[in-house]
């Protein structure tokens, strides 16, 4: 770790003194001066410093030829989405801000080509916003008074969208589906749960932290700027696959996910189930785990037979299948049962 002292150095070389004078001359320079990016570039080259750039949203289109140099783009359209709400319960609380950025994406390169539309509006929930939520997003009753979002524009933006992406989609999706049922007919992905950030050497999936990894900072907890930050984060190339994060989400949306319920698992296996990332559901008194592909599902069933059920007769598990249309929603997937005695190792 580099320790920076507030005390000035005891002596400077002639070149250092000249540089110090030049730096002092920078005081009062306007923020848009071309000198600042140059200084940031030089400081970034020093191993003891990491320079963060303020996120600047832009709607400037980029041509396909710039982005996809060797082949014609295979264009898909997506939306990154964020909400601010009056609370955590989608049944009793309301959306008071919706932010969406609609973009075009080249599935052959994993690159975002173009931002084509932006939506950010407020809505009066019809009751006072709780102080504890105002403290998070700073949206007050006065800001939303008498306002209603443009439903027609929301639905219009969704018309030709292949995928909706949210950072913690299991929170945002139930809220927006309650308010705009058209969201129910779209495929969804979650940039927290559908990307293994730890496998890629990133210790936190918090959006502000991921943005810093990408070299940017921003004022968080308002819907539109959170969307811009997420779009930048999704351009990140993941070390484990050498794919962009957004490419990983689009590809995972083409595959089913499976929730495995370890029905009647012996009590003495609870610790190894927990170590394997199974979660206990007290309402149904069962351990369960989500796996992301049919290959992983088969591996999981083999593991359960070997380490949990052994040679027990009649051992079976319940499997709930989710496509991207049901994923991260408050709806059940397609349920079936698998008799583990039929499973060949």
Where are the predicted features?
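Conserved non-catalytic scaffold segment of RNase H-like nuclease domains
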Residues: 3-186, 200-217, 311-314, 322
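Short, acidic/small-residue loops that bind anionic groups at enzyme active sites
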Residues: 185-195
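Acidic, Mg2+-coordinating catalytic module of metal-dependent nucleases/exonucleases
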Residues: 160-179, 197-264
């Amino acid at each position: 770790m580099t320790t920076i002292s507030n005390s000035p150095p005891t002596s400077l070389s002639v070149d250092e003194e000249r540089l110090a004078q030049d730096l002092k001359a920078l005081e009062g320079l306007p923020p848009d001066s071309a000198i600042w990016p140059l200084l940031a570039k030089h400081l970034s080259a020093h191993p003891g410093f990491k320079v963060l750039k303020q996120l600047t949203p832009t709607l400037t289109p980029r041509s396909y030829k710039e982005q996809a140099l060797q082949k014609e783009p295979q264009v898909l359209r997506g939306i990154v989405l964020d909400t601010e709400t009056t609370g955590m319960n989608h049944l009793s609380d309301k959306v008071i801000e919706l932010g969406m950025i609609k973009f075009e994406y080249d599935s052959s390169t994993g690159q975002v080509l173009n931002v084509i539309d932006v939506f950010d509006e407020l809505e009066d929930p019809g009751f006072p916003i709780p102080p504890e939520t105002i403290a998070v997003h700073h949206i007050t009753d006065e800001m939303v008074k008498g306002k209603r979002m443009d439903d027609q524009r929301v639905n219009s933006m969704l018309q030709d969208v292949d995928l909706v992406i949210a950072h913690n989609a299991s929170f945002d999706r139930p809220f927006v589906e309650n308010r705009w049922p058209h969201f129910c007919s779209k495929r969804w992905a979650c940039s927290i749960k559908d990307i293994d950030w730890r496998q890629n050497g990133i210790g936190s999936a918090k959006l502000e932290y991921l943005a810093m990894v990408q070299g940017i900072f921003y004022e968080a907890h308002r819907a539109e700027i959170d969307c811009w930050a997420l779009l930048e984060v999704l351009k990140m190339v993941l070390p484990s696959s050498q794919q962009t994060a957004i490419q990983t989400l689009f590809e995972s949306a083409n595959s089913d996910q499976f929730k495995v319920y370890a029905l009647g698992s012996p009590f003495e296996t609870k610790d190894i189930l927990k170590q394997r990332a199974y979660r206990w559901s007290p309402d149904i008194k069962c351990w369960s785990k989500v796996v992301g592909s049919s290959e992983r599902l088969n591996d999981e069933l083999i593991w359960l037979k070997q380490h949990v059920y052994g040679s027990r007769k009649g051992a079976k598990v319940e499997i709930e299948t989710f496509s991207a249309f049901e994923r991260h929603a408050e709806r059940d997937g397609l349920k079936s049962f698998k008799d583990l005695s039929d499973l060949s190792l």
